[in-house]
Amino acid sequence: MSNFDSVARTWDENPIHMDRSKAIATKMEANLPLNNNMKALEYGAGTGILSLLLSEKLGHITMMDSSVGMVNVMQEKVLNRNVTNLLPVCFNLEHDAYNETFDLIFNQMVLHHIKDIASIFQTFYNMLSPGGYLAVADLYTEDGSFHGENVDVHLGFDPEGLKELLYSAGFKKVEFEECYTVRRQNAGKESKFFPIFLLTASK
């Protein structure tokens, strides 16, 4: 069982997850021409919070995650809410090719968990239809205190470094904008702030 499997059932109890998703959804709506003809993919969809917020703005969303626990929660949400344009899928793009194209690929707080950033950007590019869009929300470079010790993740990202990787993959019109800030307290009850960017690019 992965760590995400073990926390799937309680994930939505943290209000930050909903607040962050709302901020990202609002920024995506402002920065991208979302419409009901779009077929979208959320990669690393977790419990589907962001996809549910965007479900009325898009035609169809494939909610993909490699955690069985997270996908089970998404399936229950879709059934309980009778949402017909959301499809939960358990799949890992880092390991296998997914033979479908999309008008929009988006994710939040997923990129720092992916080892080979250049490879996943190329995968996203190849999965986009001509003129399609990419939207990625993640941490700016941080000192490692966001996740703490013994977690194998990237410590946030320098936007300029990501720009180079995106252009190398074939993307154009790469833009970054701060969209949310996470506030956390350390062991000494001191507050620390972690800004999150929204990256957008087009094929």
Predicted feature locations:
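Short catalytic micro-motifs in class I SAM-dependent methyltransferases
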Residues: 109-113
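A conserved beta-strand element that flanks and buttresses the S-adenosyl-L-methionine
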Residues: 106
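Class I SAM-dependent methyltransferase SAM/SAH-binding core
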Residues: 41-95
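Core SAM-dependent methyltransferase catalytic element
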Residues: 182-203
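Conserved class I S-adenosyl-L-methionine
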Residues: 1-35, 50, 73, 135-161
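A short glycine-rich, Lys/Arg-flanked "PGG" loop and its adjoining helix->strand segment in the class I
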Residues: 118-130
